[in-house]
Amino acid sequence: MGEPVTGTAAGVPFTVLPPSAEVSGPAPVVVAWHMIDAPRSDAAFAAALPLAGVPAWRVYLGMPLCGARMVDGGMDAVVERARRDAMLAYVDPFVRQAALEFPAALAELRERFGFDTSRTAVVGGSLGGAVALTILATREIPVRAAALINPAVRARSVVGLVEGMLDRPYPWNDEAEQAADQLDFVARSGEISARETQVPLMLVSGEDDHPSLRTDADDLVAALRERYARPDDVQLARVAGLAHPLAEEPGIEPAPQLPIAKLVDDTVAEWLVRHLG
């Protein structure tokens, strides 16, 4: 496997892994967004979920204020935003910015690496899963396959987790409610299923993930299976022993892949190989 390539594209930090096997012609591309939990940078996510079994370019994009965009080399700025306003200073702007940055970053990376964007897959973990779901729901970028790991399916559930950590209720208002509605992908399942070609989707959910996120995962899979012409194109893999993170703390720098992450990696890779073509 070639060495990781790092840099920025359209202002977005990236880690790119070249195809690990010879491919004839331009190879497909898998674009992945990391967690805010560990692994919490593009480089760390590439190490935790390298997807080496997929004959494609694997592009890991950095979330706002993470990795090369961290403030003062740490995550304090992210924590401050979550404390200040979990919905309007953290969840909504992070997901929205990452989704808005994607097309320009993808175009620049395609010019540099020459991958085939007509065969694109999206992958996301936790809050990065909400970015991937936003891409699917907005339907502007063609996507051939998708995989989500412990995704943030409903923003209200993420806010609920922050409420628990801060031990205080979130002060919901109309603006926050509207933002949360846009990041409720069970409610938006009709938009995801309305793509001209319905995207095969694998949702990996840890048995030890937060209960609210496990419930949301079940609800999204059920909603999409109801709407898909081929319900088997939507699958839920519930993984024993998997909590929310995919890596150990601090999760900023690349680290050896954990055995549980290898299990997730194999599950996602098998799905992408089957559907990316």
Say what each PLM segment does:
Residues A10-G73:
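Short, surface-exposed "cap/lid" segments of acyl-processing enzymes
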Residues H34, G124-S126, G206:
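Conserved alpha/beta-hydrolase "nucleophile elbow" surrounding the catalytic nucleophile
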Residues I36, E207-H210, L242-A243:
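Acidic beta-to-alpha connecting loop that harbors the catalytic carboxylate
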Residues R69-R84, L161-M165:
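Short, flexible, mixed-charge acidic loops at enzyme active sites
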Residues V79-F113:
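Alpha/beta-hydrolase active-site loop
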Residues A104-L166:
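Primarily recognizes the serine-hydrolase "nucleophile elbow" in alpha/beta-hydrolase
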Residues R156-A229:
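The feature captures the conserved acid-bearing segment of alpha/beta-hydrolase catalytic domains
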Residues R227-G277:
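C-terminal catalytic histidine-bearing segment of alpha/beta-hydrolase fold enzymes
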